[in-house]
């Protein structure tokens, strides 16, 4: 063994081994790897107080410190001491690679951090940094949100576990080295917001300008240029009241990055200031920002075009899907009046197109802002206003899903927000509640239009996770789906209305799934109402897969509603 290691060390000295093998040797000796060359350097800084970006000309020393176990003795203490004696600011990129624990069983690295297995080493490191007389920036376990990259062991571990581990490290750092600037370092990929650890644990945000990784992961929305990438990454950081550092990469170096790109982005920031930086965005949002509303009765409803369930006594609301053509030709008014005659409240999902099979207006968002459909919106608002019933008006739903089902999908989030705000403020009556309706998928909060134009957030919960799964036994539980979507929407700061939900399978399986749903609904006072989708999904919406039928029997629905708390008193009597 000693002979083999000596041979490897000779090869390393000769430069004949890759960095991968070098890392393996370090791991065998339980030594940490301090890299003095790092491609990620600060290109520019976004200042939220001035809503502007400046190009960074400051000299900052960048180092990556790779930890391969939790042994304090493996810290390169002498090297770190020499570094922090320098006058220039230092940016440490700490990567805790391994859950290899001395005298203990190995465990996943984030779990090892949370359970304190790295505490002794972390404290020793922070005590070293506390002796520095220069500014120290510390970024730990970055790029956590990249879904397909799989380079680091802290990726694809779940947002909650990552947040807990980040907070653990941050609290130790603040205790033993309070002057260190803690950097939260997502790549800036869609869904970054899910991993936000909280305002009090972070001093600075950073995002990577890296075309190679983004293209590999097929980001949505897609990027047409480095400038576009930079803009969207900054847009995803708009909920956090922190400066944003743009970091270079091997594919976008400091030498290749142009100041002009930042200047152009500055112009866009000024033009769209009310979207990028708004006083109504709850910057301090953490994990419990969604408002609780269950001081009133739970709304119970159905989408039930075959009229199988609508006469059940606990139902207070019905769901109508409509489009611009139906508003124009009077079909919507007929459907709407039928619900009003039944004394039910109404969810109106308005799909901003005229013919979902022939006419697809790819410029639907821009045309909305330009006023092309004003006559239609005026007619719609006139028909639903000033009536005793509450109307929950939901426009352009499921905008964040990267498919071609609707022409308002796969669009720039800023364009969507402008169109949504135009529609939401077009006209308002006291009986109308504006509903923002994402599916609740990854990155959905990017399309958040602002709480000044939204009364409720709606989500859809269906058991089948995607169109490639037809086995009803492989469906996800209502609870697991809801908890993921609830977490993603924590920045929205509005109560939840589950305007669509459904399950596939035999009736006994459906009842079991719905029992779990009732338990979760009862636990969350943030949920204003629920509406079951009692019909088959849209034909061909699932591609070549069999279209799922979510329909349930009246007995199953009655059994489900009997499990709910805060039932409507008037209808239940």
Which positions does each model-derived feature cover?
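Hydrophobic membrane-insertion alpha-helices, especially the h-region
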Residues: 5-19
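N-terminal substrate-binding region of glycoside hydrolase catalytic domains
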Residues: 25-120, 206, 251, 277-280, ...
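Substrate-binding cleft of secreted/luminal carbohydrate-active enzymes
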Residues: 41, 241-305, 390-397, 497-573
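Structural preference for beta-strand elements that scaffold enzyme active sites
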Residues: 42, 59-62, 87-91, 135-139, ...
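Alpha-helical scaffolding within the catalytic cores
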Residues: 44-51, 72-81, 122-125, 186-200, ...
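Substrate-binding cleft of extracellular glycoside hydrolase catalytic domains
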Residues: 73-180, 334-433
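Glycoside hydrolase catalytic-domain groove-lining segments
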Residues: 78-95, 195, 200, 210-254, ...
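Aromatic-lined carbohydrate-recognition surfaces of secreted/lumenal glycan-active proteins
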Residues: 141, 166-193, 241-254, 420-445, ...
């Amino acid at each position: 063994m000693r002979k083999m290691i000596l041979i490897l060390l000779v090869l390393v000295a000769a430069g004949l081994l890759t960095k991968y093998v070098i890392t393996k040797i370090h791991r065998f000796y339980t030594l940490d790897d301090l890299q003095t060359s790092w491609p990620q350097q600060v290109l520019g800084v976004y200042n939220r107080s001035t809503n502007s970006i400046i190009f960074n000309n400051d000299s900052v020393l960048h180092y990556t410190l790779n930890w391969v176990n939790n042994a304090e003795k493996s810290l390169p203490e002498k090297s770190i001491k020499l570094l922090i004696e320098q006058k220039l600011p230092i940016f440490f990129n700490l990567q805790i690679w391994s859950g290899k624990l001395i005298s203990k069983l190995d465990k996943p690295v984030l779990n090892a951090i949370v359970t304190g297995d790295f505490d002794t080493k972390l404290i020793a490191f922070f005590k070293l940094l506390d002796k520095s007389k220069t500014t120290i920036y510390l970024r730990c376990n970055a790029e956590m949100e990249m879904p397909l990259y799989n380079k680091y062991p802290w990726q694809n571990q779940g947002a909650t576990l990552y947040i807990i581990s980040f907070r653990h490290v941050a609290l130790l750092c603040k205790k033993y080295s309070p002057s260190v600037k803690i950097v939260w370092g997502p790549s800036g990929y869609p869904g970054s917001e899910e991993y936000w650890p909280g305002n009090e644990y972070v001093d600075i945000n950073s995002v990577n300008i890296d075309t190679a990784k983004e293209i590999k992961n097929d980001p949505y929305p897609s990027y047409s240029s480095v400038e576009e990438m930079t803009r969207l990454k900054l847009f995803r950081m708009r909920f956090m009241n922190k400066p944003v550092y743009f970091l270079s990469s091997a594919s976008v170096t400091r030498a290749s990055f142009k100041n002009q790109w930042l200047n152009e982005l500055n112009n866009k920031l000024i033009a769209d200031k009310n979207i990028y930086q708004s006083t109504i965005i709850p910057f301090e949002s953490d994990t419990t920002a969604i408002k609780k509303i269950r001081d009133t009765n739970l709304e119970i409803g159905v989408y039930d075009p075959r009229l199988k369930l609508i006469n059940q006594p606990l139902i207070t609301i019905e769901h109508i899907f409509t489009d611009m053509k139906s508003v124009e030709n009077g079909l919507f008014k007929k459907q709407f009046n039928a619900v009003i005659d039944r004394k039910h409240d109404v969810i109106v999902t308005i799909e901003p197109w005229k013919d979902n099979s022939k006419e697809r207006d790819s410029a639907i968002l821009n045309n909305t802002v330009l006023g092309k459909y004003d006559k239609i919106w005026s007619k719609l608002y006139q028909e639903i206003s000033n009536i005793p019933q509450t109307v929950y008006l939901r426009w352009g739903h499921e905008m964040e899903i990267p498919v071609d089902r609707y022409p308002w999908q796969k669009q720039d989030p800023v364009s969507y927000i402008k169109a949504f705000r135009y529609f939401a403020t077009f006209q308002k009556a006291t009986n109308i509640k504006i509903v923002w309706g994402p599916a609740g998928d990854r990155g959905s909060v990017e399309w958040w239009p602002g709480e000044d134009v939204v009364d409720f957030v709606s989500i859809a919960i269906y058991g089948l996770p995607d169109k490639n799964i037809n086995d009803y036994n492989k469906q996800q539980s209502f609870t697991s789906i809801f908890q993921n979507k609830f977490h993603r929407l924590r920045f929205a700061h509005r109560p939840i209305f589950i305007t669509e939900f459904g399950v596939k399978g035999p009736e006994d399986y459906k009842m079991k799934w719905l029992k779990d749903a009732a338990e979760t609904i009862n636990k969350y006072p943030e949920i204003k109402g629920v509406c079951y989708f009692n019909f088959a999904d849209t034909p061909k919406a699932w591609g070549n897969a069999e279209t799922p039928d979510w329909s349930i029997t009246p007995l199953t629905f009655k059994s489900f509603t009997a499990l709910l708390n805060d039932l409507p008193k008037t209808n239940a009597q």
